[in-house]
Amino acid sequence: MLYNRLYKDNDFLTPTTYTQELSEYAEQLSYEDIPPEVVERAKMILLQTIGAALAAKETPIAEKAVKMAREANGGPGGPATVWGMDEKMAAVNAALVLGTISDALDWEDCSWTGHPAAGVIPCAWLAAEEKHKSGKELITAIVAGYEVYQRIAMAVQPSDERWKTKGWGLTSWQIFACILPVAKIYGLDARKINQAIGMGCECSTLPVAYHATTMSDFYHYEHGYRARDGFLIAKSVEKGIHNQRDALDEPRCYTGVICGNDGSNGSA
């Protein structure tokens, strides 16, 4: 069944099914579908990211992230572990810490679209711990997160002229690296994953990248905020927020704002 449909208030029919196809892929992906070399690479990225986060755990950036998360958590306690700190919190608050410290040293992966590991790995790990999932389910969520994130991120890359004048959104499309692993672990069906992607489009930040001008450490916290928001969005959809589907197919929504008409919009 096609999800996209005529929006009666403005007579607009979503012209493509990109969001639906990505959502169905994420729902249907199983561990058995993943080639052995991809499983091995996912494990390597997992270990690399945890190692980078542990190396950053005593930095001022980590200290401030823990204080913020602990305050939001109402003190210590919860089902999710903050790596290397002997502390547990609600997964959504632990995600703020782990997303931040995974990027704090810039030692995690480096895709040409950004640093997806700082979202995919903490979010997949914390959701799996929260829901008591297996190692195979963890790896599957990691792969689903990478596959969907990278396709969206590649499709919305702006032209050189646009990003030089309007900014580059590496912490904007990062939201999809955070939503998809949680949605997969939570067992959301394709329709709900579609909703979650739509909420990610609405909650995404502007492609400003001002930190690159000022060299602010806020850049690292942005990865933590995206990880936290990934959990909040998945939980919101799980609770029943609706009518947010097909957002990647509406050119006046996310893709038009991020890359306009001069990027690779939709081609990846």
Where are these regions (language model features)?
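N-terminal core-entry segment
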Residues: L2-S267
